[in-house]
Amino acid sequence: MTLYSERIVFPEGDWQEAPCRLKIDQLVDPNGYPLKLPLPSPRILAFRVFRITTKMETGEEIRCYHLEQLNLLDLEEYV
């Protein structure tokens, strides 16, 4: 029996369970929930999924969504 889990991995290396499946270039909030576009303001804390990896451990398959934090200039194009 194989267990499947999903994690979001923050730029500092911390991680938490992902609330849902994500895609490359998807914008998410600090809890891993997708943000609705257009954004209300560029002054929010947002991350972008830039890489997805899968690793196998004993009896478990872990999908990791690696995030990068977006700055004000990056977020302005989503407003």
Which residues fall in each region the model found?
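Short, basic/aromatic beta-hairpin or loop at an interaction surface
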Residues: 1-12
